[in-house]
Structures are given as structure tokens and as C-alpha cells.
């Protein structure tokens, strides 16, 4: 099954409309940017898009393009090719370690960024903000705000919230 970009409690999948309805706000349009920082179009507002999204962008480029990132402060959405979604390093905050009281040295295990994903080999490093996860193979479309769960074999080692990916 392909990765879902939907929120389970929004039945029609229009989470932008859902947010507008429940906040009572309307949101300003912004710019689509390419991965090089060039303006390539306009969008409804960054709240209407998720990292990894391909459909419903309202722009065409003659090749498949995906949402590769968002900047809420500047209301920009970054578009690129599938290869631009692939990231090997992820920073995680709000860490909850299950197997150890703290991590003082690198840990070798596996991690998942999505529930249905197969756990991927990773080296986990402590850092000043939480953890730095370095995957053996690039992972598709990790997004800020998503959970990262780290495993030691069949057991949960810990996890946290993704802050950024590169």
C-alpha cells in the first residue's frame, strides 16, 4: 500500500478546509518554490499541503513533482522530484527512551517513520536537541512533526518527534 498523506479523522481528506472550519480563519496564498529557491507558482496556503504529496497541487511541470518541504513562517511550499524527498539524516526532539535512561554513545538499531513501514537500519547519535538518526539507506519524505520510532530488535528502544531531515 502506498504511503498515505491523509489525516484519519478528516473524512474527505481536505485538511486545509478542516483547519479553516475549526479555526474560523482564512489563510493567505503563498509561493511554490523549487528546490533551488526559485518561485515556480502560487498555492492556496502551506496548510493545504503535506511533504510527499503529489496530487492536487494545482500546478503542472511536465514531470511528476512532489511537496519536498514547507516553511510556515514564509508560507512557502518547496516542490521537487521524488529523489528530492529522499533523506538519510533526521533530527528528533521530545525524545522518550524506553530501553535506557539516556543515550551517551551511538546506538545501532532500526527505525520507522511510518506505522506500515519496514524498520530500516539506523545509527542513533545523541545531540544537544535530542537525537540524530543516520539511516543506511535514504528514507522517503520524513516530515517535521511526524514520529520516529527506534527499535532494538523486536523491542522499542525509544522515539521522538522529527524536527528536520536532510
Cite the ranges covered by each PLM segment.
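Nucleotide-activated chemistry modules centered on ATP-dependent adenylation/adenylyltransferase
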Residues: 1-156, 161-166
